[in-house]
């Protein structure tokens, strides 16, 4: 098992050194046009539409639209109702955590 561990470490080191060797270490320099960056003598156009492009498939279940979101604060007309509804929940959670902590401490003391 120890040999497999050493082999795995060797593969990870080799992969990371290969990645570091392929990486262009020149700092990106801003060009005259804000949409173009130069890196090591090459010109790279920045296309934000391609970087953060969403799925064009209408059947995509992962697409989330702003009008589909449910806001927690919209459920309560004002802050007072929100805090009144939240206080019992916080109190109950704190009591459960306190009781569990006491049980754990009692069990540890018994051992």
Swiss-Prot record:
<feature type="short sequence motif" description="RxLR-dEER">
    <location>
        <begin position="50"/>
        <end position="71"/>
    </location>
</feature>
<dbReference type="GO" id="GO:0005576">
    <property type="term" value="C:extracellular region"/>
</dbReference>
<keyword id="KW-1035">Host cytoplasm</keyword>
<keyword id="KW-0325">Glycoprotein</keyword>
<keyword id="KW-1048">Host nucleus</keyword>
<feature type="signal peptide">
    <location>
        <begin position="1"/>
        <end position="21"/>
    </location>
</feature>
<keyword id="KW-0732">Signal</keyword>
<protein>
    <recommendedName>
        <fullName>Secreted RxLR effector protein 159</fullName>
    </recommendedName>
</protein>
<keyword id="KW-0843">Virulence</keyword>
<feature type="glycosylation site" description="N-linked (GlcNAc...) asparagine">
    <location>
        <position position="81"/>
    </location>
</feature>
<comment type="similarity">
    <text>Belongs to the RxLR effector family.</text>
</comment>
<comment type="function">
    <text>Secreted effector that completely suppresses the host cell death induced by cell death-inducing proteins.</text>
</comment>
<dbReference type="GO" id="GO:0042025">
    <property type="term" value="C:host cell nucleus"/>
</dbReference>
<dbReference type="GO" id="GO:0030430">
    <property type="term" value="C:host cell cytoplasm"/>
</dbReference>
<keyword id="KW-0964">Secreted</keyword>
